[in-house]
């Protein structure tokens, strides 16, 4: 049915749904907006933390982000600039972040949704790790679990800069 126009769907609803987590004036992001919010946040030293609200299907979820201990990683990507490109192949000490979804709790204190329904970021769930370039905050690596494949690591291959 997803390819049909909405007026032909057999099950559709309209109306307001209360967020199970009260936003209390905080913005509610969609999951890919998290990457921008994390990159802009004051997360610099191991132990620095941040909690953000993320919209997930029909509810909101608190996402906990924490800076992990530093560890060098290998990078191999192309920086594309208006005047040309540069190959970056080296060891770097990125800003390593653990990204975890906390259980969704409704106003009555009851856990909502499927207990096995993890927070998901770009198709990855479980123990998600995000590595950002310490200076530019460019995402260098994202790892987590993917259905069928298990542990998956996505690495930056090309970045377009101005």
Question: Can you say where each PLM-predicted feature lies in the sequence?
Answer:
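Acidic, serine/threonine-rich low-complexity disordered tracts
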Residues: 1-8, 48-162
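Extracytoplasmic beta-rich ectodomain segments of secreted or membrane-anchored proteins
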Residues: 18-64
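Hydrophobic alpha-helical segments and helix pairs
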Residues: 1-28
């Amino acid at each position: 049915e997803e390819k049909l126009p909405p007026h032909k769907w057999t099950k559709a609803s309209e109306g307001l749904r209360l967020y199970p987590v009260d936003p209390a004036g905080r913005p509610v992001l969609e999951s890919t907006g998290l990457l921008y919010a994390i990159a802009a946040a004051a997360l610099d030293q191991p132990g620095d933390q941040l909690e953000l609200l993320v919209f997930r299907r029909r509810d909101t979820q608190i996402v906990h982000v924490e800076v992990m201990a530093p560890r060098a990683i290998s990078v191999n990507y192309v920086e594309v600039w208006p005047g040309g490109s540069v190959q970056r192949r080296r060891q770097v000490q990125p800003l390593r972040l653990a990204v975890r979804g906390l259980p969704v709790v409704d106003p009555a204190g009851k856990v909502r949704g499927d207990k096995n329904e993890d927070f998901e970021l770009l198709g990855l769930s479980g123990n998600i790790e995000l590595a950002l370039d310490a200076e530019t905050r460019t995402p260098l690596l994202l790892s987590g679990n993917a259905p069928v494949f298990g542990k998956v690591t996505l690495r930056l291959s090309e970045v377009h800069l101005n």
